[in-house]
C-alpha cells in the first residue's frame, strides 16, 4: 500500500500501521494560510484541506479529500465517505472526508480506528515527493459497507522487499568482523589519490578505495555509501577527501552503537520493518560484543520476547517497526545516580577553603582514629627492636674485641639480637588456632588480628634486613679486621676468643658458626624470594623447565626449609666466638615458647584432621572451573560464618593443605566449600572429582554433578579448622557492606546464609508470638512453647535469638556470566524469604558495557522484558537483577552513608588488592567528611 498526503499548514509527520507493503510517503508543501482547495474538494471556503491517497495491494484507491477543522490532530474527528469514483480501468476509488459536523457512519468505524492509530504512532519517515496515483487493475469497493472489509483484508505476510534488511544484517556482521578487509587510513588516502577525479571520489570507486575488491563486497559498499550519505542528509554520487575520512572513521569505529547506526541507515532503504530472525541476528551480534555465550544460545527465545513486546496487538507478530527498535537501541538511558546530600557537599567545599595546616592535622587525626590498632602494635614492635639493638650495642662496645673490630662488631651484634627476637615473633601470627581463640576474647578490641598475615610479612622484611646486616658486618668487616690486626692487639684483645694462633679467613668461615650462618642466609633468601607476591602468584613467567620454580607449590615447599633454619639458628647461637657462658647465649630463650607453641599447634592439627572424618555428599563442577564440595559436618565441628578451613586430598597430594572459605551456614547440617582451579593442586582436585560426576544436564553446558548414592566412591578428603577470618566479625555491626570479586564472594556466602536462617527464625518467632503458629513448639536451639501470645511473652529474652545485623548490602562483581550459577540457590532463597529487605543484593557483570551505554541497551531491554514476564534475570538465572559494568563505589558508599546516618558500618572485602586499596581510601575519606563511619576489613590468605 502507498499513502500520499497533501495539504496546507500541516507540518505533522505521520506513521502508518495501515501500511502493509510498498512505501509510505508524505508531502507538506509550504503554502500561505489562504490556501485554496483543489477543485475536486468539497470543502467550504476557509477550511483546511488534506488529501490522502491510500493504495491497497488489491488495487483499490481511497481518496480522502476533505477535512473540516483547523486542528492538526485528526483522531478526534468523524469519518464520512463523501464520494466514490470509478477509475478508467473499472476499479473504483473512494473519497473520504472528515467533518466535525458530519454524521458518524457505522461502516467507517474500523477505518477511523486505524487512522487514529496513525495519529498516535507519530513516527517520522524521510520526506519524499508523493507518487502519482496508481490506477488499480483488480479489486474494487462497491459501497461504503465494504470499506472495513477492505481495510482488514491485508496479507498475513506483506510482500516486502527483504533484501534491504538482509543486506543491512550482512553489513552489520561484516563491519563487526575483525577480518573485514578494510585497510588503514593511509592506504585509503593513497587509493583516493589514484581514484579521485578533480578531488572527488565517485560511488563506483568507493569499494576499491576502502579495500573491498570482490563483487559481493562491492554491492555492500554501494549500500554502505548510500546509508552514510543518508545519515548526513546528502544525496550525492561523489565525495571529497574530508567526507571520505568521515565515512572511513565511522566504518572502522569498533563501538557496537556506531555499527548499529550504520545498520539502521542501511535498513531504512527497505520497507521499515524487521523480522524475528533479523532481531535474533542483532541479539547474537550484541551478545558477541559483550562476550555473553549463553545469551547467544537463547537468542531465538529473546527475539520472540522482543517481537511480542513491540507488536502487542498481534497483527504482525512476525514483523516489528524498525523505528521502535532504533529508538530502543540508540537512545541513551538516564542512569540513576546517587549524590551527596547538600549539607555534606557544602561541608566539603567549606573544608577545602580552610587553612592547609589545619587540614593536615585533621587528616592525621582521622588516620590515627582509623589505624590506632596497627599504630600501637607497630610502635611497640619498633620500640622493642630499637631497645634490643641499643642494649646489645652498648654491651659489645665494652668488650675487648671492640678495640679491633670497632663498630662493625656492634652493628653485627645489634642486628643479631633483633634477628633472634623476630625469628621468635614471626611464628605467632601463623599459630592459627591460637589467633582464632584470641579473636573471641577482649584482645580483639585492641589487637588487629585481621592483619596477622601482613604483620608476618612485615616481620620477614625485618629478618632479612637484620640477617644481611649481620652477615655483611661479619664477612666484609669483622673478619678482615681480625686478619689485619697487629700481633700486639691480637694477643691483647682477641687471643681469649680465637686462640693463640691467628685464624685465616677460611678458618673463620669453616667453623660451626660460619657454616651454619652461610646455610641460613642461603635458605632464608630462597624462602623469602619464593614467598614474594610475584613468585607466589606466579606473576613471574619463567621458561621451561624453570617455570616450576614459581607458584604456590614453590612457596609452600620452600617455606619448609625454614624448619632447618631454626635448627641451624640454635646451633649457630650456641657456638659463638665471643660468648662462652651459657646464660648469655640467649637464642634458645627467644625461641623456646614460640617454637613449642607452633610445634604443639602442628601436632594438634595433624591429629584433629584425622579425627574430623567427612563424607562427600554432593559434587558440582560449574563452568569457569569451579568445584563445589558438599560434605557431612563432623559432630564437634563448630564454626562461625566467615571462617575458613584447610583442605587436603591425599589422592592429589599427601603434603599440601590449602585454605578455603566455608560457604555453608553454621546452622546447616553440612559443610560446603567452593574451589576454583588456579594451579596444579586445584586442577588435580577437579580431575579427581570429575571422574565421579555425571554428564552435563540438558541446557547446562559444562555442568557436572554427583550425588549420593553413587556407584563410584569419592576421593578421600581431610579438613582442618575452622580458622578465624576478618569476615567473622560481621556480627559486631548493625549494617555491613560485603564486596566480593569473582570467587572472592565465598567468604560472604556463609554470612548471607546465616543471616537468611536468622531472618526465617525471626519470622517464625514473630508468627508464633502473634498467634499464627499452631505448633506447640519450634524445633530449634531456641525452641519455646507457642500456645498463645501470653505464653510467648513469658519467654526469657536470653532464649530468643535476635538478629543483630539490621541491613546487609552484598555486591558481587564477576567477569563471567556462568559465575552466577555458583550461588544461584542462596540468591533465590533470599529473594523469596527476605520479606523485610534486610539483605540487598547487587550482581555486576563486567563483560557487558555499563548501563547507559548504547552497546548494552538491547541487553537491558531483553533483561527488563524477561524479568517482567518471568520474574527471572536472564544473566544470573535468579530473581536478583544483574547490573552491567563496575559499581561506582563512591556512589555506593554515599548512598549507604545517607541511608544510615551516625551508624558504624562494617565494610568487608575479598578480591584483588587494587580495589581493596580503593575501598580503603574511600572509607577513610567518608570518615573524614561524613557523620557515618566505615570500618574496612580485607580478607588475607
From Swiss-Prot:
Binding site for Ca(2+): 269, 271, 273, 278
Keyword Repeat: yes
Keyword Flavoprotein: yes
Biological role stated in the UniProt entry: Calcium-dependent NADPH oxidase that generates superoxide.
Gene: RBOHI
GO biological process: response to osmotic stress
One Pfam assignment: FAD_binding_8
Species name: Arabidopsis thaliana (Mouse-ear cress)
Ranges of residues in domain EF-hand: 254-289
Database matches in CDD domains: NOX_Duox_like_FAD_NADP
InterPro entries named among the record's database cross-references: Cyt_b245_heavy_chain, EF-hand-dom_pair, FAD-bd_8, FAD-bd_FR_type, Fe3_Rdtase_TM_dom, Fe_red_NAD-bd_6, FNR_nucleotide-bd, NADPH_Ox
Extracellular compartment residues: 396-407, 536-557, 605-731
Ferric oxidoreductase domain ranges (all copies): 413-570
Residues modified as Phosphoserine: 346, 350
Quaternary context: Monomer and homodimer.
Bias-annotated ranges (Low complexity): 36-45
GO CC aspect terms: membrane
Protein family per UniProt: Belongs to the RBOH (TC 5.B.1.3) family.
First-tier enzyme category under EC: oxidoreductase
UniProt name for this protein: Probable respiratory burst oxidase homolog protein I
Keyword vocabulary terms for this entry: Calcium, FAD, Flavoprotein, Membrane, Metal-binding, NADP, Oxidoreductase, Peroxidase, Phosphoprotein, Repeat, Transmembrane, Transmembrane helix
E.C. number(s) listed in UniProt: 1.11.1.-, 1.6.3.-
